[in-house]
């Protein structure tokens, strides 16, 4: 696969539009670009001998949210990619990429419904919303919503956000993904605690 060409196509279709009203321009592209890398990192940790999966995983990661805004975006994304990449991939590669995109939102970790590649993409996708990116998402969301003070971020993290954290962790397929998730959440909570303290005019 020619990933320079594929990245240019991804930029053309995602970098210069908004997929959510409360997200920054190009958020879908930047998310997909990160997932295209992290899904391969995750594969190396879990299946170090399976490098032959990487091109398909990387391509699916790069385009998995191209359907955002046309819901269900997993289905619309697979349809769009089948047309967009028909001259870029072999028919076998295209079929595999589209199956991965179609499956990426169907998280059922306690079943054998999905194969290893599908589970890898699901986990890489979910993990990208946490850690440093989680703090970025929180701050941009509150800014777009017109919230007025920093204290609302820690109020969420130490309140209703706890249940959301638990639910998202339960969606992960692999134990190592849960370990990565836990580390990311600890970072977010440490930042939220500092925001809570400094938001009241105090010091650590």
Language-model segments: residues:
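His-Asp-centered metal-binding catalytic motifs of divalent-metal-dependent phosphohydrolases/nucleases
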Residues: 52-73, 77, 97-106
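Divalent metal-dependent phosphate-bond-processing catalytic cores, especially two-metal-ion Mg2+/Mn2+ enzymes
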Residues: 20-49, 63, 89, 110-204
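Membrane-interface starts of transmembrane alpha-helices
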Residues: 90-98
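Short secondary-structure capping micro-motifs at structural edges
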Residues: 85-86, 105-108
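Short alpha-helical hairpin
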Residues: 1-18
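Generic alpha-helical secondary structure signal
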Residues: 5-8, 34, 96, 160
């Amino acid at each position: 696969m020619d990933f320079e060409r594929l990245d240019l196509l991804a930029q053309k279709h995602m970098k210069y539009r908004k997929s959510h009203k409360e997200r920054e321009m190009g958020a879908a592209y930047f998310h997909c670009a990160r997932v295209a890398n992290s899904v391969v990192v995750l594969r190396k940790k879990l299946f170090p001998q399976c490098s032959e999966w990487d091109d398909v995983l990387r391509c699916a990661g790069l385009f998995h949210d191209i359907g955002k805004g046309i819901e269900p975006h997993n289905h619309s994304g697979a349809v769009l990619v089948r047309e967009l990449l028909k001259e870029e991939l072999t028919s076998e590669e295209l079929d595999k990429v589209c199956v991965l995109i179609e499956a990426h939102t169907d998280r059922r970790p306690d079943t054998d419904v999905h194969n290893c590649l599908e589970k890898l993409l699901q986990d890489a996708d979910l993990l990208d919303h946490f850690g440093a990116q989680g703090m970025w998402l929180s701050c941009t969301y509150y800014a777009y919503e017109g919230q007025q003070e920093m204290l609302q971020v820690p109020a969420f993290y130490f309140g209703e956000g706890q249940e959301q954290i638990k639910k998202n962790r339960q969606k992960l397929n692999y134990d190592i993904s849960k370990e990565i998730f836990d580390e990311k959440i600890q970072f977010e909570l440490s930042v939220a605690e500092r925001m809570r303290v400094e938001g009241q005019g105090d010091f650590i």
